[in-house]
Swiss-Prot record:
Position of the signal peptide: 1-21
Annotated family: Belongs to the beta-defensin family.
Binding-site list for a 1,2-diacyl-sn-glycero-3-phosphate 2: R40, N51, H58
GO cellular component, one term: extracellular space
Species the sequence originates in: Crocodylus porosus (Saltwater crocodile)
Disulphide-bonded residues: C31-C59, C38-C52, C42-C60
Name of encoding gene: BD13
Name the record gives this protein: Beta-defensin 13
Length: 61
């Protein structure tokens, strides 16, 4: 049983390290809720309205 707890703790530790803590999912969802698209560069004629993916991409509309 103790081995099971240690295995569970190790898996949870690895999982928590993989989850971004800077709110990047929230910014991406907020962009899509505003009918925008996350892109590296906005196309000609599109307007930059925010950031996505932890400020690595632009939210274009």
């Amino acid at each position: 049983m103790r081995l099971l707890y240690l295995l569970f703790a190790a898996v949870m530790l690895l999982f928590l390290q993989a989850v971004p803590a800077n709110g990047s999912y929230y910014s991406t969802l907020q962009c899509r809720n505003n009918h925008g698209h996350c892109r590296r560069l906005c196309f000609h004629g599109e307007q930059w309205i925010g950031n996505c993916n932890g400020r690595h991409q632009h939210c274009c509309k």
